[in-house]
């Protein structure tokens, strides 16, 4: 596995669980608001690459104190070794939460069929007709829709997540997006952090807005 980060303990990434978090290298989207730019290239920096053996050693040591492992990215489903890696996690008795953008339903289908994931969180970037704008690429919307259906019908715990990028999405867009969420599925809105955006224009707009805010008297 091409791993780019490892957090041995997290209380907020796996709902209701104490978990470790593993970050995979590489993403097929180029969302202008992304704040994890270092994870986008498929080729990792040798200086920051995380050794899988070290991760497994730490998890083996702590497995009785952890409730699960979150595999996030980047986009984990780009990793050819993902099923093998998840099987290693399951042999430790750890539940697995997968964070995905939903662009590879074929991979997701295999993981669900082999019961390698216990929770799936899928990003829902925008109304379907605005996906190219919010992902920065000409993406296959039908693939995301297929992943959504797989998740909802799998019986696995799941959630859909959206970052509220106000410069790129309107109130009408948010309403249309909410209509895309399957009935009965959890949907959460995430904070947009413009200071770390990939698009310099979003960073500049945030800086300008901050500069225009009145300051409290000393």
Could you describe each region identified by the protein language model?
Residues 214-218:
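Terminal, non-globular segments
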Residues 1-23, 32-44, 61-65:
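N-terminal [4Fe-4S]-dependent radical SAM core
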Residues 41-56:
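Non-heme iron-sulfur electron-transfer modules
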Residues 205-209:
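A structural motif corresponding to the C-terminal lobe/cap of the Radical SAM core domain
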Residues 56-68, 77-204:
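Conserved AdoMet/S-adenosylmethionine-binding subsite of the radical SAM
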Residues 74:
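Conserved strand-to-loop "acid loop" that flanks and positions the catalytic carboxylate
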Residues 27, 31-34, 89, 98:
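Hydrophobic packing within well-folded, soluble alpha/beta domains
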């Amino acid at each position: 596995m091409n791993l780019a980060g490892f957090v041995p303990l997290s209380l907020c990434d796996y709902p209701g669980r104490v978990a470790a978090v593993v970050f995979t290298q590489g993403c097929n989207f180029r969302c202008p608001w992304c704040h994890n730019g270092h994870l986008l290239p498929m080729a990792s920096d040798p200086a920051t690459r995380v050794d899988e053996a070290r991760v497994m050693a730490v998890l083996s040591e702590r497995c009785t104190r952890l409730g699960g492992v979150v595999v996030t990215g980047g986009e984990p489903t780009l990793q050819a070794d993902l099923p093998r890696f998840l099987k290693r996690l399951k042999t430790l008795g750890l539940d697995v939460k997968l964070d995905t953008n939903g662009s590879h339903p074929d991979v997701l289908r295999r993981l669900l069929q082999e019961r390698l994931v216990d929770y799936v969180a899928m990003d829902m970037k925008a109304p379907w007709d605005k996906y190219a704008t919010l992902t920065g690429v000409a993406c296959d919307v039908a693939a995301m829709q297929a992943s959504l259906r797989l998740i909802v019908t799998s019986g696995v715990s799941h959630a859909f997540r959206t970052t509220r990028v106000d410069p790129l999405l309107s109130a009408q867009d948010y309403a249309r997006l909410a209509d895309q969420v399957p009935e009965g599925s959890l949907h959460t809105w995430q904070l947009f952090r413009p200071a770390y955006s990939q698009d310099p224009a979003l960073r500049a707009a945030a800086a300008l807005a901050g500069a225009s805010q009145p300051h409290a008297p000393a």
